[in-house]
Amino acid sequence: MTEARIRIESLAFGGAGFGRLEGKACFVPFTAPGDLVRIRVAVDKPSYLEGETLEILEPSPDRIAPPCPVFGICGGCSWQHLRYDAQAEAKERIFVDTLWRFGRVERDAVAPFAVADNPFGYRCRAQFKIRWSGGRLHMGFYRRGSHYVIDAPAECVICDPAINLTLRDLRLVLPDFSEPDKIPQIDAATGEDGHVLLVVHYIGDNPGRAADFFRSIQPHLASVTGIHLQCGRKDSIMHVWGVDSLSYTVPGLGDQGRPLSLSFRRGGFSQVNYRQNRVLVSKALHLAGVGPGRRVLDLFCGNGNFSLPLASGGAQLVGVEDYGPSIDDARKNADFNGIGDVEFIAIDAADGTRRLRAAGEHFDTVILDPPRTGARDAVGEVAILAPERIVYVSCDPPTLGRDLGVLRKAGYRVVGSHGVDMFPQTYHIESVTLLIRS
């Protein structure tokens, strides 16, 4: 079988459309529920097929014209061809199905999906990949399914306007650098304070010369307020000029809900969507159910994104994070916002939990905000610690479901899970889930 017709029934985690062909599941990227498409079967496995669209015979009513000229080629977005309400509906269904499949979480425990009010122009961070071909600069993102760099359009539709201005300026000045092939990537980030910070990845043998070049072009980078050079791992980052950190706001619990201002330095983590981060923090605060005197442990705490809003309401908080500079940021953020009764420790989440338990510490609530790989090592330690509540923030439903399964076996039950659309135009799903000890 090389060509076939297939009706797309739904969307799957990973972004592809799902249908059935001769009894087999078939996944076809860039299709929409209701599409009738002619496909070429590209992958034929014993249990599933993967197809490539040759022709759309009957378009879905959910289908729209994607606004980006490189959509479908660029690996950044998967759903620009869908109306936003259809994207949100698909994400809610995928989230519900995934939690049931991996964690046996009932549908009634999943709250309505929190849609974004800014489905475009929301990304405050971007990693621009760079290659040179025939003396011409190509700067953008990886082609879907490869490490081949394609040019981003003049305006990436999901990036903050400040990021797009920076891309424009960099394209004008980078051709003057004497070692163009020694810069494979430039990270750009913007804060709600209006600053734009760059981290230039340099793989040459003369970082001093590279730093001198980026100092010399400062007048030509009107959109940029700080540059750093990274010559290896994150601990190699060196300051070149300008600002060292960016800031954004989150809701607080003290002083009638006064917002908190949090900063993070180059190399530190922040959510890519500041508006939806505030939605996420608000939901976490509600689910945590903490107040004055309650003991809270925040694992993977970063710069205090959840820790400090919780502590602003009087909770006694310990934050754990293995990236030392983020711990420094969290301490500075606590001081800046006048928040006491907090302790931040630079240590791995699982090791930190073990040490705190061995020291006789106990906690009413534990917050987890792990990376995409989940918290496999930490959740077992948290279960032994036996807090009354666990609030689990996740950016990957399958690893969330896996870890919820571990906690269920340890005597916890899921009482509420909230999906949040942090990443419109993609299949990625952020969420926050509350578990209570039975």
Swiss-Prot record:
A Pfam family per the record: tRNA_U5-meth_tr
Q: Does the keyword Transferase apply?
A: yes
- Cite the TRAM domain residue spans from the record: 1-55
Q: Which GO terms describe its biological process?
A: rRNA base methylation
> What EC numbers are recorded for this enzyme?
2.1.1.-
Q: Which UniProt keywords apply?
A: 4Fe-4S, Iron, Iron-sulfur, Metal-binding, Methyltransferase, S-adenosyl-L-methionine, Transferase
Q: Name one GO molecular function term.
A: metal ion binding
Indicate which residues the UniProt annotation says bind S-adenosyl-L-methionine. 271, 300, 321, 369
Q: Does the keyword Cell division apply?
A: no
Q: Where is the active site?
A: 395
Q: Where is [4Fe-4S] cluster bound in this sequence? A: 68, 74, 77, 156
Record-stated family: Belongs to the class I-like SAM-binding methyltransferase superfamily. RNA M5U methyltransferase family.
The UniProt entry, under NCBIfam families, shows:
rumA (TIGR00479)
Q: What is this protein called?
A: Uncharacterized RNA methyltransferase GSU1748
Originating species:
Geobacter sulfurreducens (strain ATCC 51573 / DSM 12127 / PCA)
The top of its lineage is:
Bacteria, Pseudomonadati, Thermodesulfobacteriota, Desulfuromonadia, Geobacterales
